[in-house]
Amino acid sequence: MGSAEARLTLASTSPQRRAILEQLAIPFEVVPPDYVEDDPPDADAVELVRRHAEGKAHSVHIEGRITLGVDTTVLLDGRIYGKAADREHAGRILRELSGRTHTVVSGVCLLGGSTDVLEHATTGVTFRALAPEVIDAYLQSREWEGRAGAYAIQGLGGRLVEGLDGDYLNVVGLPGALLVSILERSAPKLLQIPR
């Protein structure tokens, strides 16, 4: 594969991950992963996101291609917060995150580069103390649907945040700094700036 044809296969249907790759000018194609996430109740968040990222990448990987799998979750007091099942569940999650600092953890798996890589990134996110009417208004927006931790920092969910410690893009859904570091080591041709 020549550098003009170099393209990453993204094992994800996430519009946020696509937008981040576009922002970073990394050429890619999307292939929805054929992977079922199983979340044991006693799972370690880092092990979980790494396993899911690897499973997603392997589910679509074709020899000779470079494939990226990513998984993101939210962690507070040792408890994993995935996507809310419904509005009531989303409200419960937001009340628990209110006024506290939680951790966003993403696993990143790259297959098919000079070496296969499986790493993770963490970002601390502090929510301001949320009044019930703020939570209700956010729930009405439905932006929480399909989001780890029941919020989207890049949208209205940014209003809920007081501070950030780490990579903002990780909270959106793909740790950009970690991805660039991995690509520099394993697939630098994907980082060539288009002319």
Feature annotation, model-predicted:
Residues 2-25:
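N-terminal beta1-alpha1 ligand-phosphate binding loop
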Residues 13, 33, 113:
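Cofactor-binding loop segments of dinucleotide-utilizing enzymes, especially the Rossmann-like FAD-
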Residues 15, 35, 176:
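Short, glycine/serine-rich, charged loops/turns that create anion-binding
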Residues 25-42, 116-122:
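Short glycine-rich, Thr/Ser-proximal phosphate-binding strand/loop in the N-terminal lobe
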